[in-house]
């Protein structure tokens, strides 16, 4: 079978990481270990230009993220730019700090949707996971105002060892807060989550139980609450298509303007990431070496190259392949066809069986923690 690079589709989504500043310190944060400082952030005019270029390129959805996007003083102007350009805007927020104070203005500026993170259903556990006291009352007040304004609300709950027993309570909480959608997203182990893997890894029986709870709730709450489920890679049979396939559907613009094919792409050595301060977004999408590196199937090795699923999962996660197999072009070890798959599952079982989970290494703007990186499973 001949490997091909498919005709370049237009990107659908843009993840606009407006800032890495955030009042929460979640140990599973997908931001890089080396966080951009405020002084490096793009200014308002640059973000407005980037959004205009995104609309011209064919982008439909803009996810205003961070860090905490409402930490930006110009978040209302940026949201208004999305509305003026006909871009559907989704605010991905912690709901704490100054988020509530800006919510009415964001709604008036044309905000379309809110995604609110919830660390746990129980307040004390939520504070322990997020590293911030009194976060839960702020989140609940924020959610109440979102619903009062008539904005659709999605709750996002990242699931791990520390909160997996709360999945039923999280579902009840989503209903109580008036959310239209709940994302039960098991931790993806890159960024800070990779550092904290041993502290976060749940046991397989607990994962299976959480899946059954979600499936039952989907039937019970049909028409009231949509529940999305993201299963943990380390226990999966096949990998997910990272970001819909490398360089196929999504772009991620960092606070300092680098354009990435996915959150964790900077962990892959040798990739050159072009910056919106130097090049147009369309040029980056079409010609950036980083986007071309793993776009399509021509880069694939066996068994991916001849696999019937190669244009479904697009080889899985390149960053995970690097972290676990030591080769970004290797088969994602989350795939059952990888020669390392059994080792990955054994690693997950071993870490989840630790009698006492390690302490969290909390996300910090000051730089990467000085702790040993987890080992991969390369042969």
Curated annotation (Swiss-Prot):
GO aspect biological process, one term: pyrroloquinoline quinone biosynthetic process
Pathway in which this enzyme or protein is active: Cofactor biosynthesis; pyrroloquinoline quinone biosynthesis
Textual note on the cofactor: Binds 1 [4Fe-4S] cluster. The cluster is coordinated with 3 cysteines and an exchangeable S-adenosyl-L-methionine.
4Fe-4S keyword on record: yes
Positions annotated to bind [4Fe-4S] cluster: 22, 26, 29
Catalytic activities: [PQQ precursor protein] + S-adenosyl-L-methionine = E-Y cross-linked-[PQQ precursor protein] + 5'-deoxyadenosine + L-methionine + H(+)
Keywords carried by this UniProt record: 4Fe-4S, Iron, Iron-sulfur, Metal-binding, Oxidoreductase, PQQ biosynthesis, S-adenosyl-L-methionine
Top enzyme class: oxidoreductase
Gene3D superfamilies linked to this entry: Aldolase class I (3.20.20.70)
InterPro entries per the UniProt record, alphabetical: 4Fe4S-binding_SPASM_dom, Aldolase_TIM, MoaA_NifB_PqqE_Fe-S-bd_CS, PQQ_synth_PqqE_bac, PqqE-like, Radical_SAM_PqqE_MftC-like, rSAM
Protein name: PqqA peptide cyclase
HAMAP family, per the entry: PqqE (MF_00660)
Species annotation: Methylobacterium sp. (strain 4-46)
Protein EC: 1.21.98.4
Homology family: Belongs to the radical SAM superfamily. PqqE family.
MF annotations from Gene Ontology: 4 iron, 4 sulfur cluster binding; cyclase activity; iron ion binding; oxidoreductase activity; S-adenosyl-L-methionine binding
Pfam family, one: SPASM
Subunit-level organization: Interacts with PqqD. The interaction is necessary for activity of PqqE.
């Amino acid at each position: 079978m001949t490997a091909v690079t498919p005709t370049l589709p237009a990107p659908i989504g843009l993840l606009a990481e407006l800032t890495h500043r955030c009042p929460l310190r979640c140990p599973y944060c997908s931001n890089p270990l080396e966080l951009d400082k405020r002084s490096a952030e793009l200014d308002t005019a640059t973000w407005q230009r980037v959004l205009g270029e995104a609309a011209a390129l064919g982008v439909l959805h803009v996810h205003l993220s961070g860090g905490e996007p409402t930490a930006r003083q110009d978040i209302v102007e940026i949201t208004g730019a999305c509305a003026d350009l006909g871009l559907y805007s989704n605010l991905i927020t912690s709901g704490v700090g100054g988020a509530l104070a800006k919510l009415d203005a964001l709604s008036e500026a044309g905000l379309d949707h809110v995604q609110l993170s919830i660390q746990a259903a129980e307040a004390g556990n939520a504070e322990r996971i997020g590293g911030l006291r009194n976060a839960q009352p702020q989140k609940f007040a924020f959610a109440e105002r979102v619903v009062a304004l008539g904005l659709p609300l999605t709750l996002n709950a990242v699931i791990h060892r520390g909160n997996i027993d709360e999945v039923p309570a999280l579902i009840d909480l989503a209903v109580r807060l008036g959310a239209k959608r709940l994302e039960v997203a098991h931790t993806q182990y890159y960024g800070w989550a990779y550092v904290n893997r041993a502290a976060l890894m749940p046991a397989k029986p607990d994962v299976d139980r959480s899946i059954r709870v979600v499936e039952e709730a989907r039937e019970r709450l049909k028409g009231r609450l949509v529940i999305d489920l993201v299963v943990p890679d380390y226990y999966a049979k096949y990998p997910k298509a990272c970001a819909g396939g490398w360089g196929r559907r999504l772009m991620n613009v960092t606070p300092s303007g680098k354009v990435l094919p996915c959150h964790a792409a900077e962990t892959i050595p040798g990739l050159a990431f072009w910056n919106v301060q130097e090049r147009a977004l369309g040029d980056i999408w079409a010609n950036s070496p980083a986007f071309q590196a793993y776009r399509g199937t021509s880069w694939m090795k066996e068994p991916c190259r001849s696999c019937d699923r190669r244009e479904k999962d697009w080889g899985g996660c390149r960053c995970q392949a690097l972290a676990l197999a030591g080769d970004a072009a290797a088969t994602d070890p989350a795939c059952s066809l990888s020669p390392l798959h059994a080792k990955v599952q054994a690693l997950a079982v071993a870490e989840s069986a630790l009698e006492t989970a390690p302490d969290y290494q909390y996300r910090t703007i000051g730089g990467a923690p000085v702790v040993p990186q987890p080992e991969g499973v390369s042969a």
